[in-house]
Amino acid sequence: MKSIIGKKLVRSTIVIIISLFLIVKPAFAALDYTKEDLRESDFSGQDLSGSTFNKTNLRSSNLSNTNLQRVSFFGANLESANLENADLTNAVVDSARLTRANLHNAILEGAFATNTKFEGANIEGADFTDVLLRKDVEDKLCAVAKGTNPVTGRDTRETLYCP
């Protein structure tokens, strides 16, 4: 009799646990902020990997020390945003505006940024390894590139293939 009750209790517990996994959203789920107005928002230190910020206004927002791997910022306004120490590995920042953004020590490895605007951005210590950039943008970045990324150990100028 005790073993039958024990087996039923174990089965019930397993069913409850499986149900919770199917109903409750995990805390690390990617979020969709497409076309939101998030000016001056504070996302610092968060894990936003895989999230979508397409055509989102993030002007003057704090994204420092944030995991932004595989995030899409297509057409987003990141003017004057703080992305210091952010990890943008394999992110899409194509057609985004990063004018006067702080990319100090950011990692952009493998990012797609062909039509991105970087005018006045602080790129000291940023890692641009394998970033897809237009040649004219690359030349402008080389004019101000300096520093070494403390995480990857790569020199900013070398990751941009500066002469």
Where are these regions (language model features)?
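Tandem repeat scaffolds
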Residues: K2-R11, V15-P163
